[in-house]
Amino acid sequence: MNGIISKAALEARRARYPAGCRVALVRTSDPYTPLVPGDLGTVDFLDSIGTIFISWDNGSTLGMAFGEDEVRRV
């Protein structure tokens, strides 16, 4: 994936992950995070390049990058 999100994909992502919704981590490309698959968090917002900023229940605030990381709604 080239990491560039289309306007339509960005709007779909915003609709799927609105602020306040709960998510679970599926995978992340960050080798230094303490997050593991299944960890839960709450979506804060999405930025203009599709990164989902999440307040994780473990206290982390790691964002999930479009094309690199994956979460699912719970």
Predicted feature locations:
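Basic/aromatic-rich interaction segments and small domains that mediate binding to polyanionic partners
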Residues: 2-74
